[in-house]
């Protein structure tokens, strides 16, 4: 039995307590300063309000002020915060980690330097830990298609554990692997993490299609708009492969679980797709974001960071002006709040051509209360 401390009681970190508990491990779930009500619910009833289900009896809940007790004797630590809280989590871990611990990050995104250089989030997390201690910690991450509600419901889920030490990955896989939680390993740490960030960008773009159909007044038409979706999905896969080469990852990682697998499930629904639909229907990004109540959007954040780095990388000659045409277009829409325009003629390695076809203008489509209140646990992260 291993003692595992999970920092952050959001839906994914909490869902991962299920396979761990099923394997008989001592699981300690610690809330952040934003999770007070979640932990209170778990302590009182065992029910996670986001997942809307009871966690295994062996999972123990701790408020943030109890974090030292939760980390006592832990051998594995899971950083369960999202990309917006990575540096905060690193600062907490800096005082809690001990030499020899294994740390797994689940946040998906990247960080850009002033010159446009991009870094994966586990490296950002580790930066907050003093160098001497950092070198005595093993770092890993989880990629692949994984909806939290399905993990908690023990539905078959296939994921990739990535890191630089194969022996550590083997130990982690054995710790987590169950009959329903299937774990593969990869030493392409950078590649898996780049895919984890970029899949959110392209999943958002796939959401445009349904909105475009609504703008055309053909939502009920027998002729759908899957061709549009598939083209953006395919270009997203191409650009993920290009980014892996640029960052030193293995291009083939883009075409497995961590890349197209994760992008597929994220494109199936959720917040990224909902905001994409509203943009496709005629709203600007800021209008769509406001319509959805300014909810956290990891896809939009990733587009702003990664897409925003491209002009600087282009100026330095690191990438060509014709590279990443879809991501550049997404940055115009999300980062600069410009009208939707898809550069069809510049995609799939084609020579750049003058302006492609923009979707026709029309009024925005309303969002129902049911959509706004969609259960976060049962949509892709």
List PLM regions with ranges.
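Residues that mark the start of a beta-strand
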Residues: 2-3, 102, 330
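General beta-strand structural signal in soluble alpha/beta enzymes
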Residues: 105, 137-143, 183-187, 255, ...
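Internal alpha-helical scaffold of NAD(P)-dependent oxidoreductase catalytic cores
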Residues: 96, 131-138, 156-253
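Rossmann-like NAD(P)(H) cofactor-binding subdomain of soluble oxidoreductases
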Residues: 61-155, 172
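NAD(P)-dependent Rossmann-like dehydrogenase/reductase catalytic/cofactor-binding core
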Residues: 199, 204-214, 223, 230-241, ...
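NAD(P)+-binding Rossmann beta1-loop-alpha1 motif at the extreme N-terminus of oxidoreductases
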Residues: 1-54, 60-62, 113, 124-128, ...
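Short beta-strand/turn micro-motifs composed of small residues
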Residues: 8, 31, 105-107, 143, ...
